[in-house]
């Protein structure tokens, strides 16, 4: 199923976190009264969430969204996740699909030292 599909970017982040020997929860679930949100990585020791955002988080994709309305919902969800994490005192580090893997690694090393 799609829920068990991880992008190359997410796999790379996982490998870097493992390399840095950082404990994390993958696909961490945050629940509100209305719905559930899955966060790509939650690092409890750091009070940090990491989201690897693919292209579909930034622009409409027929493949991912099917309709413009679904793209708008995607953007709303991203905003709700930011607000929810902020309210819980969890920092959010967003990695864009446009970021080179080399830079992803450097950024994570800085963030987690």
Describe the function of each predicted region:
Residues 1-113:
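Nucleic-acid endo/exonuclease domains
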């Amino acid at each position: 199923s799609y829920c068990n599909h991880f992008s190359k970017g997410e796999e790379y982040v996982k490998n870097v976190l493992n390399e840095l020997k950082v404990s994390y929860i993958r696909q961490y679930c945050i629940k509100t009264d209305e719905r559930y949100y899955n966060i790509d990585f939650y690092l409890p020791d750091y009070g940090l969430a990491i989201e690897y955002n693919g292209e579909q988080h930034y622009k409409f994709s027929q493949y991912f969204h099917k309709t413009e309305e679904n793209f708008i919902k995607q953007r709303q969800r991203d905003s709700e996740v930011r607000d929810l994490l902020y309210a819980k005192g969890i920092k959010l580090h967003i990695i864009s699909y446009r970021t080179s893997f080399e830079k992803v690694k450097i950024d994570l090393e800085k963030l987690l030292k």
